[in-house]
Design a protein with these regions (language model features):
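Formylglycine-dependent sulfatase
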Residues: 3-4, 11-13, 20-271
Length: 271
């Protein structure tokens, strides 16, 4: 990859340093940078270790949680950190609807969490979403991980007319191609809170059950996409990637919900 990458994690932004470029090339890259947007679910601002470190603790009016986040800490030291960025609707589906459309929840089609036991709440098919905008601007667009912006319907691609589970699911949903809003590469699901037993539907609607800790699996798929394994993207185009990781979303009941090495960091921590 010879284009700069802008990597965003929630309120953190990193602009990767690049070597010297010819003025024309630098101008073209500035107009069409590669972008990766990573948004873990329910990640509270205070739960980042760097807020307890020199250079950060005096920038906020709260005490950071006693957490171990070495990668985010290193990332923050190389980044622009936004200390007061806020969401006016920090609830899963409504926030995702706003993020994708730029609309308030009452306009995006997603005023409620997408759940089959509630009134229909689903991303508007006629909305121009961020993926549509980047696609029209000449980007190769990829979405990985949790979407949770579509209402569960009986549209299992491998079993037409049936739901993606044996019974009507409360949460999980498959997103068909016509509802992907500009994302030409797809490896996603609706919502499913078994972090060591995730599943995904790919671009062609094939289901994958990797039996792997979901953030680890998703990061591996993103890396594979970046390397263009299998020629899955047009290398002549800049890329726009969104990665919706489910953890640290609940549950937190047992080692089935987390990696043992992470559990061991906190097992003796008083509540």
């Amino acid at each position: 990859m010879n284009k700069p990458i802008n990597l965003l994690v929630g309120g953190l932004t990193l602009f990767a340093a690049q070597g010297c470029k010819a003025p024309k090339q630098a101008s073209q890259q500035a107009e069409h940078p590669n972008i990766i947007y990573v948004f873990p679910d329910q990640y509270r601002n205070q739960a980042m270790g760097f807020w307890r470190q020199d250079g950060f603790r005096d920038k906020v009016n709260f005490e950071g949680d006693p957490v171990h986040t070495p990668n985010l800490d290193a990332f923050a030291r190389e980044s622009m950190v936004l200390s007061s960025a806020q969401s006016n609707c920090p609830l899963s589906s409504p926030h995702r609807g706003m993020l994708l459309t730029g609309m308030y929840p009452n306009k995006s089609g997603v005023p409620l969490n997408c759940n089959s036991t509630r009134p229909i709440s689903s991303l508007r098919e006629d909305a121009e979403c961020i993926g549509d905008v980047f696609s029209k601007a000449g980007y190769d667009c990829a979405y990985f991980g949790k979407l949770h912006a579509d209402f569960p319907t009986p549209n299992d691609p491998e079993h037409p007319g049936q739901y993606v589970e044996e019974k009507r699911p409360a949460w999980d949903a498959y997103t068909p191609k016509e509802r992907r809003h500009g994302f030409n590469y797809w490896y996603s699901y609706g919502t499913f809170d078994e972090h060591k037993n995730p599943h995904y539907w790919d671009t062609d609607g094939k289901r994958h059950d990797p039996k792997e800790w979901s953030p680890l699996h998703e990061s591996g798929k993103v890396i594979s996409y970046l390397k263009n394994d299998g020629n899955v993207r047009d290398t002549k185009k800049p890329f726009f990637i969104m990665v919706g990781m489910n953890p640290p979303h609940s549950p937190y009941r047992s080692l089935n919900d987390c990696e043992e090495q992470d559990f061991n960091l906190y097992k003796d921590q008083p509540l």
